[in-house]
Amino acid sequence: MHWHPQRVKHGFEGTLLDESGRVEDENFTSDYRQWFQTKAPGKNPDATGIGWNDHTASIYKLPENLHPTYWTGEMACELISNYDPTNKPLFLKVSFARPHSPYDPPQRYLDMYEDALIPDPAIGDWCGKYAKKLNPEKTAQDAPYGNFGNEYARNSRRHYYANITFIDEQIGRIIQTLKEKDMYNDALIVFISDHGDMMGDHYHWRKTYPYEGSTHVPYIVKWPSVDHVTPGKTDAPVELRDILPTFLDAADVTIPTDMDGRSLLPLAKGMETTWRKYLDLEHATCYSDDNYWCALTDGKIKYIWRIHTGTEELFDLTQDPQELHNAVNDKKYRKQLTEMRNEMIRHLSERGEEFVKDGRLVVKEKTMLYGPNYPGKENKR
């Protein structure tokens, strides 16, 4: 999803699309919406009235087998059931639009969390300015920042968790279908997400932020039985760019030397290997002028550089996993701050003097909001 043109295949033999209403127009109707109208003619697939960037919540108004989460799981199961594994290997990408908003689970999944202890948002000692809605163009329910109260946040979280459980059930159906086709043991399965959701932490909502709620994602790999990988967990900083090299390595295909990312197979097998020290994170301007940042983290410490304002943030994730305290002015973290700042200087220096000049990070007054080839948009701050 989110490709342009929507039907471009990028190496796949075919696609079935659910764009959650984002780009539906007279020239494009997603496969899900076409299917929906055959199953529920005249009904509104957006009957909850919640937008795809809203953080309010409501139960799904229609039978759950009409929900896009169910449709995605059903299409995957049908494809696997009808696939001939003796023909050639199957590469299948199953992308659930949820738990991205709208937070709209069917009632029975929400009921599972009726008595659950839902945590309040984490509120740091640094985020007071975000308590007020900073973007007057946004309505209350899609404001990127704001203090909407703990009860509101817990309600949104309850629906968010329920949507995750809904997805979990669909993944179970897919795994069962693979087993019925005798394809499971030899399958390489990766469960990931492209981003998280702040869910009110530090008065932030949605994504695009350098904080854990937005950037920290699930990353679960089920290896083929032939790889003889012992189940376990790694603390090495891994990222989404590692997926393609991992696929190539597992298929015994040579990984191009200029490819971003690293194969996870050596880590999974416990082999000695040099690994990256930090993950580099970055997002261009979004929601507010100061939300253009670069960050480095090894999972234990995180340094954030805000390019438009020249402000820094430092979080000790070992002692402060919820990022409640910005340690940038703490004397006891002075050494770590200097080390991380120097790492950022080294990281950005290859981009030239617009980012690093005379050994110092540069505050940039103007940046591109969109890339030069982004369809229908002009380059602007």
Language-model features: locations:
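Polar, surface-exposed loop/tail segments
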Residues: 5-6, 58-61, 65-74, 90, ...
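C-terminal, low-complexity/hydrophilic appendages and adjacent surface loops
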Residues: 33-34, 43, 212-215, 281-329, ...
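A long, amphipathic alpha-helix that forms part
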Residues: 70-84, 120, 145-187, 250
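Active-site His/acidic residue clusters
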Residues: 78-124, 140-155, 198
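Long, internal low-complexity/basic segments
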Residues: 144-155, 327-381
